[in-house]
A protein has these predicted regions:
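Beta/alpha (TIM)-barrel catalytic core signal, keyed to glycine-rich beta->alpha loops juxtaposed to Asp/Glu
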Residues: 1-129
Length: 130
């Protein structure tokens, strides 16, 4: 398991190549970047004291949310749910065999599952009929 998402791509440098070479799958955790890639938050957002993001550095949070706005404007297809896009983005890397998103509602579970429709048939984890 490694932290991997559109905002944190460090595993692409050494971890993923090593896993591919050894034929090991990668479980990408925190694929929505603690909710920043959900599309729900804009720069200037604040979080409740009981929210783990409340303890994040305010300047880093602002920078992350500004980057999310750039990603939404330039990378996410119009009309596509940002969270689904972020999960599919992780799954499109050949090293990633599974993402581990969190969810707080049945709707989020459905949205998380819907991301699979954006992963191509040629992905090594794509469902194959026998």
């Amino acid at each position: 398991q490694v932290v991997y998402n559109r905002l944190d791509r460090k595993p692409e440098d050494e971890v993923f190549p090593s896993c591919i070479e050894q034929n090991l799958g990668v479980l990408a955790r925190v694929p929505l970047a603690s909710g920043y890639l959900s599309g729900k938050y804009k720069p200037g957002a604040t979080f409740a004291e009981n929210d783990v993001r409340h303890r994040h550095n305010a300047e880093q949070t602002r920078q992350k949310l500004e980057e999310v706005e750039r990603i939404a404007a330039n990378e996410v297809p119009k009309g596509m749910n940002m969270a689904e896009w972020a999960l599919a983005w992780c799954l499109k890397h050949d090293a990633v065999t599974c993402v581990i998103p969190g969810c707080k509602s049945p709707e989020q579970v459905k949205s998380n599952a819907a991301a699979a429709q954006y992963v191509g048939e040629n992905h090594r984890q794509a469902w194959k009929e026998a």
